[in-house]
Amino acid sequence: MEMHNKNLNELTIVESLTLLKEGMISSVELTKACLDQIDKYDNKIKAYITVTRDLALEQAHSADAQIQQLGINAWDSQPLLGIPYSCKDNFSTKGIETTASSNILKGYIPPYESTVTQKLKDAGAILLGKTNMDAFAHGSSTETSDFFTTKNPWDISTTPGGSSGGTAAAVAANMCIFGIGSETAGSIRGPAAWCGITGLKPSYGRVSRYGVIAMASSTDSPGPLAKTVQDCALIANIIAGKDNLDATTADSPVENYLHSTDRYSLKTLKIGIPKQYINIELEDGVRTKIEDTIAFLKDYGVTFKELDMLDTKYSIAVYTILQRSEVSSNLARLDGIRYGQTRDSFGTEARNRMMLGAYTLSAGYYDAYYAKAQKVRTLIIEDFAKAFKEVDLILAPTMPNLAPKVGISESSPLFGELADVLQEPSSIAGLPAVAVPCGTYNGLPVSIQFIGPRLSEELVLAAGIEYQKINTHHLNFPDLERTTNV
């Protein structure tokens, strides 16, 4: 679809900036287009918890005034000036309710800003609102939200994934130009896959966690959800980097990710395909599209190598133990402290995870569970290090199945762990990965992911950008008139 034939809210970041710089559109027009889309469709999609309409329009008017005064120079210090975005509700936003979709934090107004949202604010981005999620990020469908369940814009009888499901749905439904989410083990890539958009899970420590309500502190990674890999690269340029407020951030330079394709080409890279990621139980539609994608890339000139890696079942066990243990520790700080209004207790999923975590950390069981899980985690990290001596990148399906019907997750206590089985290993190892659409099957999106060595964002983004230059899958968006019957 040509840029000038799109509705304003359908534009990418790069397209929006081009038109803003040419004076073809204003930030107010762009912001109103997104707000109008929210008004029209969000009563069915339910992506947003809070819409900051007045603030967004105020910021848009301010952006237009700066552009009027400074012209093209306005973007020198504010590279996202005038661009509206959505933000997952576990990022602290000063003066704006931040709930993590939990009744525990309902009414909580943070007195400070997260590093990520502060960087976006400094870059001139405009906050449209806070998006729904699984409560405290405990889930892969948004069904554990204490408020409501977000629906997949491609088919509102299906889940958008989670825990960043609200952000992914908002991007897919063109209710924002881009969004911000967080991932512990699939919470960016999973929703991106099921909603047919692009999602970047940065290396652990590449982006600051300061001001993000913690789930599992050793794997939590903030990152962008957008319409293209190029847009994700632009956002990563802004939010990545060392932060003195987060001691776990990497003290290494941030490359200009938009220039990554100048250094890398898919045709000169060796890409590994772990047989353990392909030989697992994949839904027929997913397997068909993955095989088509591999054949397409081979025809393009990509060199593939089959890899023999650790079975994914180990990652499921390790992640389940470590995540529950860290949840138990992190949520203990909230119990009994009045953050907001009178509220209900923790939801069922949060209680389940805290109890299991308390068990694995308790005397007599620590060595049997938590300590052993940490040892196996080291083996997983070493397994990836060995693989990356043989290949430059790893390619795999992002999700093993198509977006399931709302309600399916309630039938399995390990729904999220099984859905995220292809993402958990790289999350445990702290590796970067980008999920990109590779087609649709029976009207639902299918996605692949490029996984790279730690701190190789430039490499995975280069692969994703080139992939999207040679196909059009990322240009497909849901027909909301049909799916929502508006």
Residue ranges: model-predicted function:
Residues 3, 65-77, 257-268, 484:
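Short, basic, low-complexity termini and linkers enriched in Ser/Thr/Gly/Pro
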